[in-house]
């Protein structure tokens, strides 16, 4: 504490004292309530023990200013209201003094701000400017400490988070950033400026209030620090997209990658869905008049749908009611409570009613009281928390076996597929995700029977803890009453708690496995989308086939269709068709053939390989490659394909799509629904809503970071840019067709439906080619003297005027755009243009040197002289924003980071499966990545499998170790053959290295 400022010290100490004496006051108030309410019984969290509390120390007013003294007292305004766990007490849902405390907190913050302003006003202007960043940093630290001390959360630097928090490694442009130098927090979106967080930083007010803090639960489930979760929630609440956050707000999320950010977003949506479901269920039960205080408390504590189902199932419409409900209707709840509160005065014989069913005998009375007690135990939060924590440290396994069904009902092939799981048992902490998905599929097909097994020691320790601690009667209980209590515990565990735990374990395992499967699908899709393009080539696309022939399509280097045809290579006409193929290749000077991997792919590949080996296509040096044709047939009959290639046969459209997948994979694959690309694992078994949301987000991420040229890109590609959708993309294309090309980014504000938020999200990912604009401007100037709506001057700034559109009210639009801005061809966001201009002035550069070697030399020399931190401090910005500016100024205009990824593997010959031998070293291309291994195409017609145990970090390069750039489709690898199973066509490989 010695390193803290004086104000921070006083506040932290004050909070500790308040927390200590608040617990003392709660105990004393609880004892007073017990005396007043005839000693109402409640479950005991700990063994009763006499404890002395030290008297509170009164602080001296002279040593502590009034603001500091009140700070700890009003800090509760940011805390989540805690509901007391009492069976007979009213549920506190809202704090009546909450608003007053918030008002006091705002007053204190206002006083601090005013005091800071007075100090700054007393300093000279030059001094204030040089020390501004330092003051902001100190204030940010003090605010962070104050916020942490006022909340119930553990600070991010404590040992609790030390072993669990995600730590991202330094990354390149694609995973977007390096580790931040410090944690900078903000309540609003910064404009490239260093920011600070308010005192109640970790408090997020949700529309639906629960008894748990959404920030804390989100942090626990994702293993991400609370301050990062708070920032992320605020960013998502402000409608920021993942690409925008990753590139331009990375200091607020501690450099998380896109996959981690998507995980936070999905978990946040799940928690909010649970909260909404809880409150809708509460309203339904209230209308039926079945709501009680204990039920309300239990429902507001629910964090999952399984917990809510467990609590609310007996109260659903049409339910026959539980055994406990029927016992309560008979009036036995008083007997059950008396057993815990006043066992010495309880007489079960007084409840006997010979003419009432369920009360006719003493045994009926005991069973009814037992059912009520079992229900109370199974719905008590403290009890459920204890049993869950107990299971985490004990042996809990999942078992699967062959289902006892007749062979007529189950396909024998399905039984053979699940041979590994017919006698399977594994600890739930060690089981793999793909095993869970396989077991679930077998269970759905009625092939397997699955159960969760909890060791008997868990039950014994649970019952012992309940008797001695949580559910111990207040006074001495007779042996027959203790027998009822023990029977209640056994009944509660066996009939209620055990099934609940099994459902929770299965649901958690399935949820985690589905999420990992979806994440793997997303990573594979990213690798495919970011495959390096092959520009500047004329390509022949081949869609193989037998009876209907092989469809051919030749496209130009600009993706224009030059020729289409059909050849029959596998119907005895191979020699005749070879001459036609040769003439086509020679006429269009095409030396690259792209073959789809569908039906007849192997035979078509052998056909072309044989002709190439015979040098049949001389003087052309022809090569070929195999590309996935997944989704090509679906796209060929879609309305978009009909609009793009009208009048062309759908089969020939597939050949065109296959060729374009090599020329520009991203531009072609975005036309296909992601789930049809087919690079996943169990993708048809997982939540389709989650799968679609994740894959759409991955497509948006890839398209945004590659960037698009607004004046030549297609509508299909444009709709996947962050902040845009189908309607906005359509409006942009219509504006471009009506008014000509966009001169700079500011003109986007004139497009219908593109508001300030949409412009903020998309502007940094839209590029404007300056050479194209200069050519267009010169042509327009020669013909008409002035570009429509654009006056060209020497200024680099932009003036905005109001343009009235009829009688309707219109937004302020850019009517006069003074000239093209060279910064519009970079990844620099318009909000940082002012900082970029000041940086250029500092290094002595100009806008016309962007992307040139001279600019790179000036930047390097300036960085060596000053350093990143000093430059960022001088420009009053963050290091991350400065890095984006440096990258934007250094990268050439034609920069495409996809060139760092692997290109298609072009071949001239073919290898057969029979030619392989154990120990042979081959090079191949990753075809698919799953949770259990990597499938590699080694050119023998059947993919080999690298088991996941053979993919170690030592064999991966530094960039491949990152989660977002894991080994995936398109990667070239060197492998060694470990085993060959020719009858089953299986090849086992070992990874040597990544090429």
Swiss-Prot record:
Gene (UniProt): SRBD1
Organism expressing this protein natively: Pongo abelii (Sumatran orangutan)
Site of covalent link Glycyl lysine isopeptide (Lys-Gly) (interchain with G-Cter in SUMO2): 84, 134, 166-167, 183, 185, 955
Location of cross-link Glycyl lysine isopeptide (Lys-Gly) (interchain with G-Cter in SUMO1): 185
Recorded GO MF terms: mRNA binding; structural constituent of ribosome
Gene3D superfamilies: Nucleic acid-binding proteins, RuvA domain 2-like, Tex N-terminal region-like, Tex RuvX-like domain-like, YqgF/RNase H-like domain
Start-end of Low complexity biased regions: 146-159
PTM sites of type Phosphoserine: 861, 964
Disulphide bridges, residue numbers: none
Coiled-coil blocks: 258-288
Protein name from the UniProt record: S1 RNA-binding domain-containing protein 1
Biased composition (Basic residues): 116-132
Domain S1 motif intervals: 919-992
